[in-house]
A protein has these predicted regions:
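Long non-globular sequence segments
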Residues: 1-118, 192-195
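Active-site nucleophile-adjacent alpha helix/oxyanion-hole segment immediately C-terminal to the catalytic cysteine
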Residues: 66, 82-88, 92-106, 111, ...
């Protein structure tokens, strides 16, 4: 049994949303890794049905909070990734762009770019997703039992730490090193493919195969409506 996201979102004295979670041992969640551990237990956005119309707004607030917390981590570890010829620079830029693709978040991304200007050397299109992003779309998903807002949250977790991919006992897809490595080296590509599969059930991996139609994924209706061994519907991104 999981928790609703709203159990962990509150507001500070300045009116800004904050993430407030405590582990069972009494320790407060403080690092971005702590945040991800807590969020991995979230199974719905709103605990109260009356709050359902605000679901997307809660996920949007979370995206900003997560990126600000991740910025602290980037600051603490910049010797490991922040360098003109460091390949991790590209990964971080694509993590930010993946967040833009998923939620349209701009302010927190600008904050990271201002602190780490070398990221601007990586070609990205952050602003393109401000109005047109995965979270804001209203089309039904191919996976009928999926919730778009929850799926967005789950992908954000995996963008920041691909180790959360395929951690379930029952999955729509089996353990796949290809997917893990994709999220690790190009997070934007990972979320685009996952989002397309969830939305339409079809994805052509022409970038990997060299041309269209050679490497194509198509989800059958049986898979889209798959149930776990316990009999309940599958509803997480894995």
């Amino acid at each position: 049994m999981g928790f609703p996201l709203t159990d962990f979102l509150t507001y500070g004295d300045d009116g800004q949303p904050i993430f407030d979670a405590t582990f069972t041992d009494g320790r407060k969640a403080t690092s971005y890794q702590d945040y991800l551990r807590v969020l991995d237990e979230v199974t719905q956005i709103c605990g109260n049905e009356d709050d359902a119309p605000l679901s997307k707004a809660y996920v949007q607030k979370l995206a900003k909070i997560l990126l600000q917390k991740y910025q602290e981590h980037l600051r603490d570890t910049q010797n490991d990734w922040y360098g003109k010829n460091n390949p991790k620079l590209y990964t971080v830029a694509k993590q930010l762009e993946a967040f833009a693709f998923l939620t349209g978040e701009q302010e927190a991304i600008r904050g990271v770019l201002e602190e780490f200007p070398l990221l601007n050397s990586i070609k990205c299109h952050y602003e393109d997703y401000q109005g047109d992003n995965f979270l804001n779309k209203v089309d039904p998903l191919k996976f009928k039992n999926f919730d778009r807002d929850l799926l967005t949250l789950q992908m954000m977790i995996r963008v920041l730490d691909p180790r959360y991919i395929n951690q379930r006992d029952d999955q729509v897809c089996g353990v796949n090193a290809f997917v893990h490595n994709m999220a690790l080296f190009n997070p934007l590509k990972y979320v685009k493919i996952t989002a397309e599969l969830a939305a339409t059930g079809v994805c052509d991996l022409k970038e990997f195969a060299g041309k269209e139609g050679v490497l194509r994924i198509e989800v059958t209706q049986a898979v889209a409506n798959k149930k776990s061994s316990a009999g309940d519907t599958l509803h997480d991104v894995d």
